[in-house]
């Protein structure tokens, strides 16, 4: 691990080149550079524009349903017999996950820039649904690129996107998952720069996307902080979230980064184990490289070729991670740990039976880590976990594995 000097604040990045230490940046085709700089310029203006912020907050309250509740998981806490467990209930948002927070923010930006066509990539389909939703709300055509493998395992979300008026384009290249969908979306963007806005769904991609997505998702952590102080009179001892590209995680982590009493853990997809290639634990088992416009930890071979990862959860099935997470790992502020498919599956069932909440398989990875850690902590300690999405979309996957025909 690089011995990077600790900054005064963990929340001041990225620098003007979009870098978090050695990570991030803008590695894009020349044709995209003017567009990226234009986007950055508009983003900088929007950040400080009271009218933009007011519209964002209004839609957050009346369209998304914010603030999402902070929920004390009483039965899970009792069952594990250790720390008190609280969930930030992002699965109760409109469209069923945290993805909508970012989509509303970015579509307002797209309109501000005068763009008339939206493109997006999606893995689990949650970002695709959220993109199609905001495109419908603002009357813009939307094309969603989705890996053919994911189209198959996320049928309900594909149908939702089509209902919402989006065109879903299955991508058969590579392993037909999120990485391949993102490649296709970038190709589309390069050829349609004039009228098209690329609505990236995770805290990755070229600058300013990682910063922008983080800022739109930070509403999660900001609300949770306030709600936790109201409920317990203090901050949590531990904050946990699942990490694929890392937008739900950075959204809850960021407001807590400068609170030294708060330990932070990101949970990666351990898949079928770290020994082979069937996992998506980019930080635990990857190395730095460049993909989709930014430098970050990636799953790659000795020649720098991107490996095809695996996770039971389509939303974590990405061979990279947002650059800010790479930096936070290197400087030791956040710990990143893997959870295997079977552990996530077990946690999925545990939460459903104990709390009456069916979580997304992505969030089930975080629950599995909470189940491991809570019993090792004292009863007066507090865990805050981001319950990033609901599991309706995953019942077919889980049903198949458990041998229950649907």
UniProtKB/Swiss-Prot annotation:
Supply the SUPFAM superfamilies for this chain: Tryptophan synthase beta subunit-like PLP-dependent enzymes
Q: What is its EC number?
A: 4.2.1.20
Q: Which reaction does it catalyse?
A: (1S,2R)-1-C-(indol-3-yl)glycerol 3-phosphate + L-serine = D-glyceraldehyde 3-phosphate + L-tryptophan + H2O
Q: Which residues are recorded as modified (N6-(pyridoxal phosphate)lysine)?
A: 99
Which Pfam family, giving just one, matches this sequence?
A: PALP
Q: Which keywords does this chain's UniProt record carry?
A: Amino-acid biosynthesis, Aromatic amino acid biosynthesis, Lyase, Pyridoxal phosphate, Tryptophan biosynthesis
Q: Which PROSITE patterns match?
A: TRP_SYNTHASE_BETA
What does the record give as its pathway? Amino-acid biosynthesis; L-tryptophan biosynthesis; L-tryptophan from chorismate: step 5/5
One function term, GO molecular function aspect: tryptophan synthase activity
GO CC term (a single one) = cytoplasm
Keyword check for Oxidoreductase, yes or no: no
Which class of enzymes does this protein belong to? lyase
Question: What interactions and quaternary structure are annotated?
Answer: Tetramer of two alpha and two beta chains.
What this chain does, per the entry, is described as:
The beta subunit is responsible for the synthesis of L-tryptophan from indole and L-serine.
Tell me the protein's name. Tryptophan synthase beta chain
Q: What species was this sequence derived from?
A: Rhizobium etli (strain CIAT 652)
């Amino acid at each position: 691990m690089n011995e990077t000097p600790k900054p005064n604040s963990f929340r001041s990045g990225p620098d003007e080149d979009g870098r978090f230490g050695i990570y991030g940046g803008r590695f894009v085709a020349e044709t995209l550079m003017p567009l990226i700089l234009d986007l950055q310029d508009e983003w900088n203006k929007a950040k400080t524009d009271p009218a933009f912020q007011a519209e964002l907050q209004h839609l957050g309250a009346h369209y998304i349903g914010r603030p999402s509740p902070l929920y004390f998981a009483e039965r899970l806490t009792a069952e594990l017999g250790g720390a008190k467990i609280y969930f930030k209930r992002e699965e109760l948002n409109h469209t069923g996950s945290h993805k909508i927070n970012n989509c509303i923010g970015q579509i307002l930006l797209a309109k501000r820039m005068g763009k008339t066509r939206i493109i997006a990539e999606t893995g689990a389909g949650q970002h695709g649904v959220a993109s199609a939703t905001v495109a419908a709300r603002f009357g813009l055509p939307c094309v969603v690129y989705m890996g053919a493998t994911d189209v198959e395992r996320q049928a309900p979300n594909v149908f939702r996107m089509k209902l919402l008026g989006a065109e879903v384009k299955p991508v058969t290249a590579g392993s037909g998952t999120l990485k391949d969908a993102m490649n296709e979306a970038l190709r589309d963007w390069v050829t349609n720069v004039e009228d098209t806005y690329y609505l990236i769904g995770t805290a990755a991609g070229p600058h300013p996307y990682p910063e922008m997505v983080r800022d739109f998702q930070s509403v999660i952590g900001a609300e949770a902080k306030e709600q936790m102080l109201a409920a317990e009179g203090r901050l949590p001892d531990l904050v946990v979230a699942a990490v694929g590209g890392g937008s739900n995680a950075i959204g809850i982590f960021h407001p807590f980064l400068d609170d030294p009493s708060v330990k932070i853990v990101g949970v990666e997809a351990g898949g079928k184990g770290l020994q082979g290639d069937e996992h998506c634990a980019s930080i635990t088992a990857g190395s730095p490289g460049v993909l989709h416009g930014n430098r970050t930890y990636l799953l790659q071979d000795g020649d720098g070729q991107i490996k095809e990862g695996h996770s039971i959860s389509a939303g974590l099935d990405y061979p990279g991670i947002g650059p800010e997470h790479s930096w936070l790992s290197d400087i030791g502020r956040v710990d990143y740990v893997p959870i295997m498919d079977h552990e996530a599956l077990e946690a999925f069932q545990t939460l459903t039976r104990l709390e009456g909440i069916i979580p997304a398989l992505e969030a089930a990875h975080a629950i599995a880590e909470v189940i491991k850690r809570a019993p090792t902590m004292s009863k007066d300690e507090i865990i805050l976990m981001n319950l990033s999405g609901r599991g309706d979309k995953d019942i077919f996957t889980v049903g198949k594995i458990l041998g229950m025909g649907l």
